[in-house]
Amino acid sequence: MKEEKDILNRDVEIPEVVFRKADAALNQIRANTGSTKATRKVTRIQGRIHHVQAAAVACAVLIGAGGITATAAVIHHLWSRGMQANIQATEEQQKNLTDQGMVTQFDQAYTSANSDLTGMEVTSEGITVKPMEMIADGHFVHLSFQVEGYDLPDGEEPFFETVKVYTGDEETAEDSFVNMNGSFYNGIICDENGNPAYEDGTPLTADENGTTIERYKAEDGTLEYVMTLYKPDPEESLLGQMLHVQMENLGTVNKTMFMNGIEGTWSFDIPVSGKDAAQTYELNAPLENVNVTVLSAALSPISVRVDYEVTGEIQAQEDDNGLPEVGGVVLKDGSRMLYLLDGGQIGYQDDTHAYEISSFDRVIDVDQVQSLLF
């Protein structure tokens, strides 16, 4: 078992627009996590991301040669622009995920008379919403919707006043709860260094007031709403379940205030298809100075789960339970993919066992991963 040690010390400036969206996402998560155990936590994205000591643990046996590099901002799109921003991938990676059975492209289903997914678009008050794509593994579901017919004023941020997502027959049942983080895609992605940029690779620009200019509209004037979903119980998967999605009232938002709303309801029942493509590695690797042993890691192209054993006291703070978090991966060619994690949860299962599940903002080639960075 190879073990690396590495010191990362890097500050990344995050513009106000990204920080504001992180706050909105956190508030949405908090609103949706009332029934989860108190030991679980959602980590807030800070205005500055500071990486300090990181221990890298080997998580795969070397198989063959070769490697991959971090994806660039400008690529050919097979997926919708919002989904591509949510999970950046090369054209080859997009095809590979489709071949693995992890991708459902609803626009193809609409043209198939034999598909159970036909006729899913809903029109209310002249605004049509329809699912575009779904990417799912054993832990996370990414779902994108196209919104057509809404005239978004320049400089405004589109917003659904209410978005509900649940499984099962009863919305209020405990086992129906789904963690959800969703927003309209604003034309901004994070590059391979964790810095925000427009989807065409150009740097962000600001208006005369210094506010970052966001690009919600596609060339055809449509908008795209993208959500990431997972069950609060890390042992439960959404695969094979029926997602009930309801969006109500479309308008704009300014400093958390909903404005100019058009009353409407768009409801969908979406069966979750995908594939649990994770590869699990038994590690039993102690991390230095934190009294934590990494028992195992399960890597899929779009997410990671890590199971820990807590072997002694760890330093916890008010909003941080002190557990280590995955900081990236090292590939077999020696290159690193940092700033990968894009939301999830970390917490205790009992006094000595803990876990982390997190989605990635980029697709990775699991076979080319040599080690994890903490």
What are these regions (language model features)?
Residues 1-47:
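Disordered, charged N-terminal biogenesis/targeting segments of membrane/secreted proteins
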Residues 10, 22, 26, 68-374:
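Alpha-helical, hydrophobic structural elements that either
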Residues 15, 50-53, 365:
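Alpha-helix initiation/capping motif
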Residues 31, 44, 49, 56, ...:
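Intrinsic structural disorder/low-complexity segments
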Residues 42-74:
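Internal signal-anchor transmembrane helix that establishes type II topology
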